[in-house]
Every structure is written in C-alpha cells, then in structure tokens.
Regions:
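Acidic/His-enriched low-complexity segments
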Residues: 1-131, 260-262, 277-279, 295, ...
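Hydrophobic alpha-helical and helix-loop surface patches within well-folded domains
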Residues: 60, 92-317
Length: 317
C-alpha cells in the first residue's frame, strides 16, 4: 500500500521517455492520480489537489532543473508530520506505527535537518537552492539515504531510532542527515556531467557532513575515527591487483553500479582531505563557493573543479 521511485543511475526511462544521463537536466511537471486514502510527495511543492469519488489527483508545481536520476515521487498510506521552519513547511512521511518512537525522534529529525541546511548555506554562501524540503522514511529502503532534491528518502530504521540510542547511533544518524542535506548542493545543485565523476558528489557530501556534525559530538576523537574508518578499507583494496583509480571511465551507464565501493567511499575522502590541508581551509572554501556558483543548476567535471581551485594555490594542481 505504498510505492516510491528510485531511478539512480539509469531508470528514469522506465517511468517516462527520456535520455537518461545526468548532464541533460530538465524542469518536470508531475501529476499523480492515486487512491483516495493515499498521500503523495515529490521533488516540487504541491500545486493543487483534485478530489473525485474514487481517487485523488495531486498536481505538483514545476521542479527546478534536475537530472533524471534525481526525479522522485512517493505515495501510499504514509502518516505525515509537519512543522514550520525557516525553509518553509517541512513534512515527514513515515510508516512506523509506534507513535511513542516517532514522538521521541521527531524533534531531533527536524533540528538535524535545519542545522545542516543552515551550516551549508553559511559555508557555501548559497541559500537552499530548491523550493522545499520534505523527508520520506521508507521501511527496508535499499540505501541509508537518497538525496532527491526537495524530497530526501531515508531507510526508516536509520532515522527513527529505537529506545535509548547510543552516542554512536546518534552520531551516525546526524552524519547521514548531514550527508544527504549536503548533496542538495553537491550533486543536486551542481551535478557531475557523467557518472565517471560520481565519486565527486559522494566525497564532498561526506566531507561536509563531517564538518557539520563533528563539533556536535566533542566526546569523540573524530580524527582517530576518520583514520580507523577510512584507511584500513582504502588500503585493503588499493594494495590489491584489482585496485582502480578514484575516477574511473564509464562507457555504459548500465555499469554505473560498479563504480561504488571502498575506493570512492574510503580512499577518495583521504585524498580530498589532503587537498584541503594542502590548499588551506579558506582557499579551499573559496574555490568550492566559486565552483557552486559557476555551475549552479548545471553540471561540472573534476577537471572543471580543478580549473577553479588551481589559481587559488601555489600548488600545481
């Protein structure tokens, strides 16, 4: 009694006719006709609802330009909680029937999202770039999160925590939320031209998430945690004959799933942290601000980012 889209990397063409590649962005109009007892959420705000005896038609406003793999909607028998924020009304769609668990978690969910949004706005000097932000909690979702602009999906159990969660579980949830919020800028506002640069959006979202969350958990040794979580897994692959570069060529989008793995998620963060340390924090931030402004609502490659960063350092990037 619910359904959702998950179109990354090349499945949008199973929903509507399109060229399924990230550098062909478009603004989408979406209309859904669903059973009367269902609700629906999508990338853009709801424009109007048309009721009939047997169904409900949801007409959504036009989206900002987005890549096809980021187009999203979910509908079904979801419960909805809503709260006004400085970013407009923020709704949480969830399925869990444990009202006590939901009530224990809901304020933290709102707070973590608004904190992350505010931090990203301050760091990038770019206001939240989409029309609204809703949260969709899906049981048994394939990933911990997916950064659809305006409608972030999460695995429900990763966000609605049980009982009295440990500090480590609270840190993991905060980091997950910060990661997906960071993607609204790195990945959604500016998207890779092709999936050979998919690592770029992932590594920036991870870097930003650490910057957002780590000060909130001062009892952790975050540098030690970074070393222990990334270096062993990066070396375990990098020392083998089957190691691959961080940036890999991709001839066929059907093989995009092969790009994900320990090299992207564990070696790439080490390389990017070294780049930030070598350039200096301020120069690195200045470069990222210029990168996001230059390619806003468009696409960029690693080479185009390097062209922006290179003049800001004495290093020969």
């Amino acid at each position: 009694d619910y359904l959702y889209t998950l179109l990354v990397p090349d499945r949008a063409s199973t929903v509507f006719p399109c060229f399924d590649q990230p550098d062909l962005k478009a603004a989408f109009n979406l209309t859904l006709e669903i059973p009367k007892e269902w609700v629906a959420v999508a990338n853009a705000p709801l424009g109007k609802i048309i009721e009939s005896d047997t169904s409900t038609v949801y007409v959504f406003e036009k989206t900002k330009p987005v890549s096809t793999y980021l187009f999203a909607f979910a509908c079904g028998k979801f419960k909805v909680a809503s709260q006004p924020t400085r970013y407009g009304e923020m709704a949480i769609y969830y399925r869990d029937n444990d009202s006590a668990k939901v009530n224990r978690n809901i304020e933290a969910i709102y707070e973590l999202h608004t904190q992350s949004l505010g931090w990203m706005e301050n760091y990038t000097a770019i206001p939240y770039p989409f029309s609204k932000l809703d949260i969709v909690l899906i049981p048994d979702f394939q990933y911990n999160g997916m950064e659809h602009p305006g409608a972030i999906y999460y695995r429900e159990s990763s966000i609605l925590l049980e009982g009295d969660p440990s500090e480590n579980k609270l840190l993991n949830r905060a980091n997950l939320i910060a990661h997906e919020v960071s993607h609204q800028w790195f990945g959604d506002l500016v998207t890779m031209r092709w999936f050979n640069d998919v690592w770029l959006k992932e590594v920036f979202a991870g870097l930003m998430a650490d910057k957002i969350v780590n000060p909130q958990f001062p009892e952790f040794n975050h540098q030690l945690s970074f070393l222990l979580s990334h270096y062993p897994r990066a070396y375990s692959v990098d020392r083998t004959a089957g190691a691959n570069p961080i940036r890999q060529e991709l001839d066929n989008l059907l093989n995009a799933g092969s790009l994900y793995g320990d090299i992207i998620y564990h070696k790439a963060p080490i390389a990017l942290m070294q780049l930030e340390m070598a350039m200096g924090v301020s120069a690195f931030q200045e470069g990222l601000r210029k990168y996001l402004n230059t390619y806003s609502m468009g696409n960029a490659s690693w080479d185009e980012l390097i062209d922006i960063l290179d003049p800001l350092t004495s290093l020969n990037l």
